[in-house]
């Protein structure tokens, strides 16, 4: 159809489609940990163009943005904002695996908290950290969660909302509108056996998954994938 449209610009105007379908297109879906970049803009234009073509052919199209708001990267976002908010590191010493963009400082300045941190508390927070960059940020995340749970929750929620609002505004200016913003957190936790993600996992494990080396693997190679994929790591 694209070849026909390329050769004849009026192709879609004259095309009649008798097999109309409901089609969902999930695109952009950048992690809500910072502003969109040019690559995301390209994906937005591409996905929206596909949606418009399918709509012109008579299909019912739903555009979805999948918001990964439940992963480790969101913890790193919250940790980065916390460290900036309370000036735990100098500019040159800021953790390598933390987010360092100017937007982190903007969020830190914008959020209002009813707690403060003393100099000795800051020193304790950043004392004796691992040398490995990933272990260092994970240790900071764990310490902040344990010692400042209320501030952590407020910063995490505020930072996530701030970034998502910025993404929405940029996409609106780009004239790309999504029918649905699906939040990964709505699936619940694996620790909750009644959650949607636990129910889905149980169905998959019944017929299309297996355990190996302490991890749960999806038999995706049976469905055209080049290899099986890990669902739950050990």
Where do the PLM segments sit?
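NTP-dependent nucleotidyl-transfer catalytic core
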Residues: 1-234
